[in-house]
Amino acid sequence: IIMIADMNCLKIINDEHGHDKGDEALFKLASYLKKHFGPIGECYRIGGDEFCVLAPDVSIEYFEEVCQCFRASLEAEDQETAYPFSASMGYVRLDESGIDECVKKADRKMYEEKRRKGRVRI
């Protein structure tokens, strides 16, 4: 499984609360990704506010359970911060189409979720 995660509202955090809070939010998101997905795969920051999780040896059902725990953690953190704290994620099963195509599919799914209403979208 490959997942692409993108922090929501980073520009708002930077503009309204300062870049130090934006950096803090990115660090928190990375920490939550590592906490939840680290035991089942590898987590990478691939761009400004974009992250990637590779979990090739886990079932989709278990991955979805981990996603729900991750989502609950982000929602709880959002209640505790003075700024909006959320992320959108998209994931796909790795297949024979190759890693590049799977990344594109996961990225498209993430952007579909980002367009929907709600704070933490998976």
Residue ranges and their predicted role:
Residues 57-58, 97:
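Hydrophobic/aromatic docking surface of two-component receiver
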Residues 35-40, 69-82:
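Short catalytic/binding micro-motifs of nucleotide second-messenger systems
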Residues 4-6, 90:
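Residue-level recognition of well-ordered beta-strand positions that form the cores
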Residues 19, 64-71, 75, 92-122:
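Catalytic-core segments of nucleotide cyclases and related cyclic-nucleotide turnover enzymes
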